[in-house]
Amino acid sequence: MKNIHINARISFGEWDQELQQDVIDFVNYYISGGSLRAVADPSERVSSLIAAALEGGAARAYRQEIGGVITELRQLTELPGFSTELLEQLAAEVSRLDSGKLRALAPRTTRNNQVDAYVNGPQCLEMLLEEIAKARRYIHLSVMLFFNDDSGNRIAAALLHALDRGVQVRLMVNYTVTALGYGHNLAVGRFSEISDRLEQAGAKLQDTFHSYYSAMEWSRRRAELKAQGIPERILFLQDKVQEDVELTGLNVIDHRKFMIIDGITSIVGSLNIGDQYTFATPIEASASVQVDGRPMGVPVREEEWHDGCFRIRGAAALPLNAVFQSRWLLLGGDFYDPEDALYRSEGNTDFGSEECTLFVSFPGNPVNLMQQYYLDLITYAADETVIVNPYLIDHAFWDRLSGLGPERSCHLTICNPLEVNDHPTNRAAVRSNMYVPFCNGVSFYDYSATERFSHWKITYDHRSHAVFHGSYNINERSACHDFELGLLVKGEAFAAKVKAMIDYDLSVSRKITDKREFFKHPWMHPSTYVNTATRNYT
């Protein structure tokens, strides 16, 4: 391992870029509650150094005030309780940690990206097809569901054209869950009809349903991967999955949704591929509200869902491709190195002004950084904060929200499809838990007023001009059982555009004004117990 220091302190002047990043990663990870056992043995010394500085929560509150993540050395020096002496002592201890593992667990930040937001099927489908058509070297796509319907086949056709141009195509899809189809239509679940065509044309595919090995299988597979040169920072990720999963692994889902093209373009979202998400039917468009020249609106058909994604141009593609690589190799895919010239940008990656921080989680992770982001977002709310999410079934979220006083609650707005929802217990979870937060000042909007389902997952934090978007649901599955991925974007102009999108959704939703729509005494309602019994499952 590089930079093994034995001094009690390492002065700022001696910090190279690698050590600086390691200290930032460590502090972010530890403030969020991450266990050091995954990256240090023994870890008592470094834990004792930082524990006193974190007492009282001032450092955590400051981190949320600046957007939810520390991204530079200056912010480290401004953390309450973190003196120069403490940071220099931490540097000496952090230099002994396994930086590869630490970086796999901590958020990854890039700067000077250009980010654009898209909502509803037509916008997202058009953009996806355009970006695939531009690909010249490679396309890496990870998605939970890829349906054999109109838009699914249009995207498949675009991938086939890319293969004809000599573009490398790698896909990770959950074949088994896709096979369930939607709307009582099993035919749309026949992804094998698409995958067969793609494989015959030269694409490489992996089924993410097989994310767990038996103990014997993993022991053998781990030895094979290690012999092939796969680094420990990747292998230990599957170790954690193996330790966490019970029996069969059937309750593990790769829920991530992202794409990387040519090392320069990334797409991150909450949508899958198929007519529920990437439908081509024109929306019922607003006559007056547009963002970047694209109209806001509501899906016309009941079976079409409101959803969205971000397109990012810039350096964010590199850490995203590293995430793809780790899953790809652990699933049995062919080796590739995201640092190779083929997979990096061919030129300048400065496309804009947005700072992008990538968050990932997986079954067995020492701490779920996305869950912790949401908890801190509400705990330290001091300005307008909006959360849009389809499923509100995370007990930790509700406990934290119910414990807030009016001085925090008054800044919070939640938008959720309360009545029109594909999860049978979302309504019960909200009605059983929202009474106290509502009385304390949290605003609640029901997107069901549109008679459509919103699958969009996004937050807006006015204080730090930050937006968070990705696959993460506010439920027990995303918090504990699934592979998830999200992007925190900081930038005033971009945040304002996303806020305009959210404001449109709020304008077509129903604002709940009567506290009696929520349960003052949840224990009196049978649905409360059904929600409690099933909250760990899809």
Describe each region flagged by the PLM:
Residues 2-538:
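Charged, low-complexity intrinsically disordered terminal segments
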